[in-house]
C-alpha cells in the first residue's frame, strides 16, 4: 500500500478495526527496527508516532553508524564489540544511507590519546568490532597526518590514527527501515499520540488509546502486547501504566553546528579532543559543509524542542579554533545547528559523558514491554532482543509461534542494490537511465545515491513533472512528491528537516523555496488555510531556531 500520507484514512480505519500481535509506541529508529523485525517474523504489527518519524532523537545524532571507539576508554567492551559488528550489517543492508568514512585521530602532546594508547586502542577496536581487513587502522606520522588534513593544529602534533567509521543520514535510515516494515504488512502512522493504555479483566495491557494530532480524532488500537519504544518519552509513557520499576531515564543534550566549507575547508573527517574539558568530538565534511559536534550536557526541559544555546555555540567554536587554529571560525560563520536529547538510563553520580549508552528491556506486571537507552548503531540488535522476548510471551500466553529473526540479511527499503559491493555500479547504471529520461547527470546521481532501489519511483515522478510549470527546482519537486506518496510527509518540516536534511545542510535553499514547498503541499494534501498559515509559521520558527543562539535553560523551572 506504501507508507503514503494519501493512505492515512485507510490506515486509521485498519488500526481501529484490527487486533494486532503488537502495537509499538514510538517512531524513531528503535521503534522502526522493532516493527521491521516483528513484521519480518510474521507478526501483525501496528506502530504510532506522536510527532514525525525520527523527530525526537533519531534525526539529531552525529549521523554516524559507528563502533564507539570512545567506549574503549570507559572499558565498555561489550558495547564496542556489538556496535562494531552491527555497523557492518547496517551498511550491507542499506548502502544508500550509509557510507564508509575514514576518520583521522590526531595525536598531540598532552592529548587524550598518545601513540601507544592510540595504537593499542585502534588495534583492540579492529578486533572487537570485526573490522574488514582493508578497513583496519593505520598509524600515521606527523607529516602523513597533515597531508590528510592540513588544517589540524601543528603545535605538539606527534602523528595520527586512521580508522573507518560509517557516515549515515539518521532520519533517512529510520524512514527506510520503517518503509520495509510497512512492505511486510505493518500498519504505521505518524502524528498520532498514544494517550492511555487499554486493560483486560486481569489488568493486562491489551492495547492503547490514541489521538490523531492532525484531526483531533480519538480511537483505540487493540493488541495482544504493547511495546514502549518512545525514546526520551519512555518514562512519560510508563507513568500511564499502573506498574513500573525504579529505573528511570537521564537525558543529556548534544548539539552540532554546520559551517560552509568556504569558511572551514575541511577535507577529512576528524575525531579530536577539546581544550576545555578533554571531551572527544567530530568534525565531518558533508555536501559542501563541515559539521562539528557534539556537546554533552544534562537536560531537563522541553523534549520536543531542545535548542542550541549561545553557550553551546561558543563551546563548539572554541573547540574548532583550538584544533584548527588557522580557520578562525566566528559565531556568524555558523549557518545552521541542531540539538537532540539522548535517552540514557540514570546512573547516579556520573557525568553526562560517563553514563553508559547500553540499552535495557523492562517488563511490567501489566505485560507492558519497554526498551530504553541504546544507540543508533545498535537498533537492529536491540530489536532482535525485544522481539525475541515478545515472541516468547506470545507463545506462552497465546500459543503463537513465529520465525527466528531474519533482519541480519534483510535489505532495508531502497537497499535492494545487490549489496554494498555492487552499489557503485548500481548508481552508475541508474545515472545513465536518468540521463535517458532527460535528467542532468548530477541530479540523477544524487537521487540514485540517496534513494537506492527506490529511485525508479522518483524517475517516474520526474518524467511526469518535466512538462509542468513548476515553482520548485525539478529535483526538489520530485523528492517532495515522492515523500508524500511514500514517506508519509504531511508538514513542510517533515520534508525540509527529516526527509531531506536541507534545514541543516542547505538552509539557503530552504529559505528560498519554503513558501513554494508549503504551496505545493497545500495542493497535494488539501490544507485548510489555517493549516497553511500554521505550517508556514512552523518552518519559519525552525529556521530561526537553527540559526541563532537560543536562551533555553537546561532545566525547566
From Swiss-Prot:
Species in which this protein is naturally found: Staphylococcus haemolyticus (strain JCSC1435)
Molecular functions per Gene Ontology: glycerol-3-phosphate dehydrogenase (quinone) activity
Pathway: Polyol metabolism; glycerol degradation via glycerol kinase pathway; glycerone phosphate from sn-glycerol 3-phosphate (aerobic route): step 1/1
Keywords: Cytoplasm, FAD, Flavoprotein, Glycerol metabolism, Oxidoreductase
UniProt keyword Kinase present: no
SUPFAM superfamilies: FAD-linked reductases, C-terminal domain (SSF54373), FAD/NAD(P)-binding domain (SSF51905)
Name of the protein: Aerobic glycerol-3-phosphate dehydrogenase
Pfam family, one: DAO
Domain of life: Bacteria
